[in-house]
């Protein structure tokens, strides 16, 4: 049986900065959520192929061409332990065609605890002309013995050229839903769901049919 996931995402735009926030309930312990996030951080720093295979399921090219107006293809990742940052390399696709190749992004991860809540902040320090400023925080919070919440707050300000191209509408159609789906992937993995591209194809079809 297919259950369509219905979510509510809040996105604002102020002075060129997009801010997306989202929270979802997770039917498992905070220990399981933390293990999933630990695995995600490890893959982010050391294994981009596994990161894509496990956590980016359903985030790539879509049948709905509007969702392909702008998206990124992750190519490689290197972690520099002495500097405590990751160096990522990706391609930018516009309307499903290569637009920028081998864009270098340097980012760092800061993992802290605030009481029982875990906050994982990712800061982008360098992204060439693609991004002027970007940072985001994932929050993992226990709400019961086998109940948790996963939340995100993401801020993105693109470089001047992309600010012309990426309107609020384009951002909504190409980026918003991918951020939400990434959090949903973290949730489903924590709950023990075996994620596949077919899983999200069925979910998308169910939402369209509603």
What are these regions (language model features)?
Residues 2, 10-33, 39, 137-210:
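Terminal "cap-and-tail" regions of soluble proteins that handle hydrophobic small molecules
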Residues 2-87:
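Hydrophobic ligand-binding cavity/cleft-lining segments
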Residues 15-20, 40, 59, 77-79, ...:
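Generic structural signal for short, flexible, solvent-exposed coil/loop and linker residues
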Residues 32, 62-129, 184-210:
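Glycine-rich portal/gate segments that line the openings of hydrophobic small-molecule binding cavities
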Residues 53-56, 113-117, 148, 174-180:
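Glycine-rich loops and low-complexity Gly/Arg-rich segments
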Residues 134:
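Mobile, glycine-rich extracellular loop/lid and propeptide segments
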């Amino acid at each position: 049986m297919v259950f369509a996931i219905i979510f509510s995402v809040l996105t604002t735009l102020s002075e060129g900065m997009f801010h997306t926030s989202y929270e979802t309930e997770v039917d498992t312990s905070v220990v399981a959520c933390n293990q999933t996030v630990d695995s995600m951080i490890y893959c982010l720093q050391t294994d981009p192929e596994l990161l894509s295979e496990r956590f980016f399921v359903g985030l790539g090219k879509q049948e709905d061409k509007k969702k392909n107006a702008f998206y990124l293809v992750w190519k490689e990742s290197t972690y520099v332990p002495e500097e405590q940052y990751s160096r990522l390399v990706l391609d930018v696709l516009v309307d499903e065609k290569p637009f920028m190749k081998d864009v270098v992004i340097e980012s760092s991860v800061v993992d802290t605890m605030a009481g029982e809540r875990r906050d994982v902040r990712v800061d982008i320090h360098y992204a060439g002309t693609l991004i002027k400023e970007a940072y985001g925080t994932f929050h993992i919070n226990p709400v019961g013995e086998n109940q948790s919440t996963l939340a995100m707050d993401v801020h993105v300000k693109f470089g001047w050229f992309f600010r012309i191209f990426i309107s609020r509408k384009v951002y909504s159609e190409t980026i918003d839903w991918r951020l939400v789906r990434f959090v949903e992937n973290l949730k489903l993995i924590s709950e023990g769901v075996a994620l596949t591209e077919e899983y999200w194809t069925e979910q998308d079809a169910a939402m369209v049919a509603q």
